[in-house]
Amino acid sequence: MMQKLKAAVAGICCLFGSSASGNSILEIQTGLRALHQVQDEIARGVPDASQLQNAVLGRLTEIFESSPNSFLSGQEAQSALAELALSGGDRTRMANLIRLSQGSGELEPLLSIVQFYLEADMTKAALAIEEAEGMEDGASGIEHYLALAKGTAWLESDLPKAREAFEQALLDAPGTLVEEVALRRLAVIGLQQKDADLFVRCAILYSRRYAKSPFAPEFWSGFADGIQMVSNSKDI
């Protein structure tokens, strides 16, 4: 665990040692890797990791905001921007940057999903997902984040699709903050659908990996209802 955090700190040091006007996609990608390492430690309950996360999110946002539109509209930059936006970047600032980056390119449909997700317009996000169907090849490296966004967009309108998306996130990103979020949301779906097997599977995996997560209280808040649902549906 400490090795991962040390590696993240090394990446963060490189990020803060760079010029904000350098517009280096390599710097941004290094920063994103460091961010994800820190977030995975947050999910496991490592103290002080949240402060590192906030610093990296702020720095990466500054780099994007100091970049010209010509840089933002490049496919690598668009992909990295979508990744940052879905990784917890400030929603208002991220949505503005995504609007500036749009114009043309393979990632335009996927950027629309991210923009509506950031704006919390899940109806439009769901429509954008339908329009982007079959275009996932352009989202290499951010599939698990898009799976979370898709699942969230479908939560109120299509629980089976939402469940499928969150299950995909579990497969794509085991042992990460993405998995932690997906498990919490799948547990809620298990309760709503009275699916005891799904709830138990999520509860076992969550308790093994994320019991110390700062987000764990949200999971445990529905635990009693889940146990009651399981006891009503199984002989235990």
Residue ranges, per PLM feature:
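Conserved small-residue packing positions in alpha-helical repeats and bundles
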Residues: 82, 112-116, 150-151, 187, ...
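Sec-dependent signal peptide recognition
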Residues: 3-11
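Solenoid-like repeat scaffolds
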Residues: 63-69, 96-105, 131-140, 167-176, ...
